[in-house]
Each structure stands twice: as structure tokens, then as C-alpha cells.
Amino acid sequence: MGIVVIGDVFIDIKGYSLSPYIPQGRNAGTVIQIHGGVARNVAENIANIELKPTFISAVDNNAMGDDVIEKLKRHKVETKYMKKVENGMGTWLAVFDHEGDVVASISKRPDHRPIERILEECGDEIFQNADSVVIEID
């Protein structure tokens, strides 16, 4: 099985102001949305160097959750232990000023109970062939 990675998936929503940021005003800029979460990033990067990680996590039971799983599969991350549940992934909303510094952020944390259930139900199977385990749960 190789490397087991356990942790969260986040969706990062990042807004970049094109001019000096005005906290109480309207700010023109760009907004991007990307898959994030430290553990998800680690699993994808391990796969990018062809080490075949298994990712233990949860995603929301919607199209965004499906998209996260499909992207991980395209990178050759084993996703069979990922669960689709309500509040399965977090969201990080960050606002950056025109110089690239974070000026505001809000974070919605995911529910970790689905990961606990995966480990209770499948832990022996998951860890029996693991060479290494990476755990990151914020």
C-alpha cells in the first residue's frame, strides 16, 4: 500500500484585490477556488512523485466533493477509503491585498467523525501494508 495520508480536504477561496484593499469598502479584483487542505495537498504531491499514496478523508456529498475525488484519482491517489458526507470538507476564505498579503480570512472546519469511523471500520486493512503514515488534522 505504501504511504497512508490521513487528514482534511478544504476548498480554498482566495480573493485578490487589484488596488489597495479597503476593509469597509468594495474591492475590485480576482477570485479563485482551488482544492486544498494540508493532507490533501500532501497526498497529491506524494502521488506526483509516483509513490502511490492512500488518502483517508471525507468530502462533501455534492459535485465539489466528487470533483476533489476525481482529481485525486487522476493523480493516482488511492481514494477507496474516502467518504462522501455532509460537512465532510472545510472551506478557507482568504482576502489578499494588492501586494499579496492576507488581510482577512474565515475558516469553516470539517466534521472529523467520518474519518474516525473509517479508521474504526477499516484500520487493520489500511495499516497492514503501510510503509509510512502521515497524519494532519487541524
Give the residues covered by each predicted segment.
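Conserved N-terminal subdomain of the carbohydrate kinase-like
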Residues: 22-26, 48-132
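Catalytic beta/alpha-barrel core
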Residues: 134-138
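Hydrophobic beta-strand segments of well-ordered beta-sheets in folded domains
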Residues: 3, 132-133
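Glycine-rich phosphate/adenosyl-contacting loop at the front of the ribokinase-like
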Residues: 1-56, 63-67, 73-74
